[in-house]
Amino acid sequence: MRTLCSLLLIGCLLFSYDTPVVGFLRRSVSGFQECHSKGGYCYRYYCPRPHRRLGSCYPYAANCCRRRR
């Protein structure tokens, strides 16, 4: 019984926190969502001529571009 409880406790502790990969994925998704919520799109290279750069999209450091009005 003690062994079972110990294994259960170890399993809960291992899976209860976010790993660094999960934090990285959350930042990357939030970067894309933030760009799209501003009306932009993620473009890997420089923004085309009539567009301007709003920021960057994670994880590839792509540019968040939006057309000038």
From Swiss-Prot:
One GO-annotated biological process of the protein: innate immune response in mucosa
SUPFAM superfamilies: Defensin-like
Leader peptide range in chain numbering: 1-23
Disulphides: 35-64, 42-57, 47-65
Location of the protein in the cell: Secreted
Name of one Pfam family that matches: Defensin_beta
InterPro entries associated with the record: Defensin_beta-like
GO molecular function, one term: CCR6 chemokine receptor binding
Domain of life: Eukaryota
Keywords, comma-separated and alphabetical: Antibiotic, Antimicrobial, Defensin, Disulfide bond, Secreted, Signal
Similarity comment text for this entry: Belongs to the beta-defensin family.
UniProt xrefs under PANTHER family: BETA-DEFENSIN 10-RELATED, BETA-DEFENSIN-RELATED
Protein name per its UniProtKB record: Beta-defensin 11
This protein's encoding gene: Defb11
